[in-house]
Amino acid sequence: MNEFTLNAEQRSDLGKGASRRLRRLASLVPAVVYGGDKAPESISMLAKEVAKLLENDAAYSHIIELNVGGQKQNVIIKALQRHPAKGHVMHADFVRVIAGQKLTAIVPIHFLNEEAPVKKGGEISHTTTELEVTCLPKDLPEFIEVDLGALEVGDNVHLSELKAPKGVEFVALAHGTDLAIANVHAPRIVKDEAEEGEEGAAE
């Protein structure tokens, strides 16, 4: 059984007012499924099922089996609209996955060996925490690993330095953009203490 599944029903009552009623009265999340040379499909899902699925971070970059009224189709999450204060999902966009056709998806970055630069006196800043990739469905990675173990204070990592998994292409690089991924800098508190020491000496 696929670990990543969602049950849904088609909905014909559309519009912002209808979506609000779904969320308020029936604890449902409105959503749209599109792509794959088929017409967009408006659906609704139980909010508790959506929340349970998203407890697994891998769901954000994994192919999901969506069961709409008994008809199964493979999709990926394209976008989620969340409540600004409470954080729960208010609306979802899914894109159909077609075997043999490349897809574009957002994949999280997993940073490895972060303790090494910290032990050398550095602080790590994550400039980018997810990457847009394009690949065939069978090659879709759940995450991209970035090893920070060899970094020294003052070092940084750019997208061009990462090795993409087999069959995977980084969209930003394809468009000529070399994203900054992470950097190691000296702790700001050291600078502040030095300035305070200078001020004390001046007095």
UniProtKB/Swiss-Prot annotation:
GO terms for molecular function: 5S rRNA binding; structural constituent of ribosome. HAMAP family: Ribosomal_bL25_CTC (MF_01334). Part of the 50S ribosomal subunit; part of the 5S rRNA/L5/L18/L25 subcomplex. Contacts the 5S rRNA. Binds to the 5S rRNA independently of L5 and L18. One of its GO terms (cellular component) is cytosolic large ribosomal subunit. This is one of the proteins that binds to the 5S RNA in the ribosome where it forms part of the central protuberance. It comes from Pseudomonas savastanoi pv. phaseolicola (strain 1448A / Race 6). Belongs to the bacterial ribosomal protein bL25 family. CTC subfamily. GO terms for biological process: translation. Keywords: Ribonucleoprotein, Ribosomal protein, RNA-binding, rRNA-binding. This is Large ribosomal subunit protein bL25. Pfam families: Ribosomal_L25p (PF01386), Ribosomal_TL5_C (PF14693). The gene is rplY. CDD domains: Ribosomal_L25_TL5_CTC.
